[in-house]
Amino acid sequence: MKGAPHMAEKLTPREKGFSEWYVDLVQKAKLADYSDVKGCMVIRPNGYALWENMQRVLDKMFKDLGHKNAYFPLLIPESYLKKEAEHVEGFNPQLAVVTHAGGSKLEEPYVIRPTSETIINRSFAKWIQSYRDLPLLLNQWANVMRWEMRTRLFLRTTEFLWQEGHTCHETEEDAEKETRQMLEVYRTFAEDYMAMPVMTGQKSESERFAGALRTYSIEAMMQDKKALQAGTSHNLGQNFAKAFDTQFQGRDGKMHHVWQTSWGVSTRLIGGLIMTHSDDAGLIVPPKLAATHVVIIPIFGKASDAEKAQVLEKTNALAADLRKAGLGVVLDDDDTKSPGFKYNEHELIGTCLRIELGPKDLAKNSCVMVRRDVRQKEFVSLDEAVSKAQAMLDAMQKDLFTKAKSFRDSHTFEVNSYEELKEKADQGFLLAHWNLDPKVEARIKEETGLTTRCRPFDLKQEPGKCVVTGEPSPGRIVFSKAY
């Protein structure tokens, strides 16, 4: 075809370089790009569409549980962060500070939001007077900034998009219930929508959020067997409430500090989705989060003008029927591109299902359907095209989860000695006994590159001996190399 574009660029194979494959995919699938601002990325429309769908699902899940959206300032007075000593110490190396504005030096510097516990507590202290004002359940969709030295698109950037939930409660029990409930929301979202199996559990003291009593996380395994912390939920206790004097008059008539939680997920989830499912041909997106479910590609070959018109009429009608069924559809009738180019292009950008239709298919009242994940042709009657497309997308969603879970489970091991831990350091999730000593944890990280991920809730915990020191251990914790 004269003037036709060349075949889509190939990605670095995962086996040759997983990191290079990932960067290739993100850029060539037009998900994100580098910017001239150090450590900051440009999220392109293909990537932002994924984030919008994640937002849509999560926002409904939050609101169904009674949370309401609000928005707080990007700039936080530096003194606010200093009110909670552990919090400012934990974030200090990552802070971006504004010292000048309007042509002059500020009396007090502002910190660009790394997270919003401090400034939100300032408002909570004004809004909450009585136990009748509780629980207070808020969520914020925002951008945050944490100065990162080593960045990677979606996974670790200086500026990123996220949601952060902030809640206040009467009792410690209520706060703990909320913390665990929101972790379960994240697990449900990761598994039911992202088709990404996760372990849920409690983080170690060194991995705990600065200023929290306890931190819980969801941990996923990527195809290179590294862990990705995909979401966190924190029981803040009364630490921030005491720092900002966030009190309420209780049912006993006395003043009490509120009990608080915070929880969040970010655009890092997009990186997790990519590394869980995608292949050497490009992006694979679980249908529940896809912006485009179906691409219809007319196949003309040596068809006459009349035959082309018939094919286009049918493909337009089919596209309309699929859209009525609630699917995102693209009709790719660009005659400057060959069918082969279009196949590669839509595999690269992660379109879930391809439908091919030419004059010969039309004569048989059939079409060809190809699922993105298995890439096998299936001949389908046009009378059943809509129901078959929906069934294939449902099957794809389930199969992606099953495949990812099988991969994770086959790379999860119990280890019973330090030698075994070191030998299996690159093999996935390692369940090992540890004595809870942060110094031992730091030694393991330095000598093996392994970090503690979480103490899984669904693992029956039995006492044992620390694999490093032989000292008593209350149970096994997941060690893994991680992003």
From Swiss-Prot:
Signal peptide interval: none
Chain segments annotated as coiled-coil in the UniProt record: none
Keyword line: Aminoacyl-tRNA synthetase, ATP-binding, Cytoplasm, Ligase, Nucleotide-binding, Protein biosynthesis
GO MF term (any one): ATP binding
Catalytic activity: tRNA(Pro) + L-proline + ATP = L-prolyl-tRNA(Pro) + AMP + diphosphate
Compartments where located: Cytoplasm
Matches recorded under InterPro entries: aa-tRNA-synt_IIb, aa-tRNA-synth_II, aa-tRNA-synth_II/BPL/LPL, Anticodon-bd, Anticodon-bd_dom_sf, Pro-tRNA-ligase_IIa, Pro-tRNA-ligase_IIa_arc-type, Pro-tRNA_ligase_II_C
GO CC terms of this entry: aminoacyl-tRNA synthetase multienzyme complex; cytoplasm
Transmembrane segments: none
Highest taxon of source: Bacteria
Enzyme Commission number, as recorded: 6.1.1.15
Database matches in Gene3D superfamilies: Anticodon-binding domain (3.40.50.800), Bira Bifunctional Protein, Domain 2 (3.30.930.10), C-terminal domain of ProRS (3.30.110.30)
Biological processes, Gene Ontology terms: prolyl-tRNA aminoacylation
PANTHER family named among the record's database cross-references: BIFUNCTIONAL GLUTAMATE_PROLINE--TRNA LIGASE, PROLYL-TRNA SYNTHETASE
Domain notes: Consists of three domains: the N-terminal catalytic domain, the anticodon-binding domain and the C-terminal extension.
Subunit structure, as described in the record: Homodimer.
UniProt family annotation: Belongs to the class-II aminoacyl-tRNA synthetase family. ProS type 3 subfamily.
HAMAP family per record: Pro_tRNA_synth_type3 (MF_01571)
Role played: Catalyzes the attachment of proline to tRNA(Pro) in a two-step reaction: proline is first activated by ATP to form Pro-AMP and then transferred to the acceptor end of tRNA(Pro).
Protein name: Proline--tRNA ligase
Species: Myxococcus xanthus (strain DK1622)
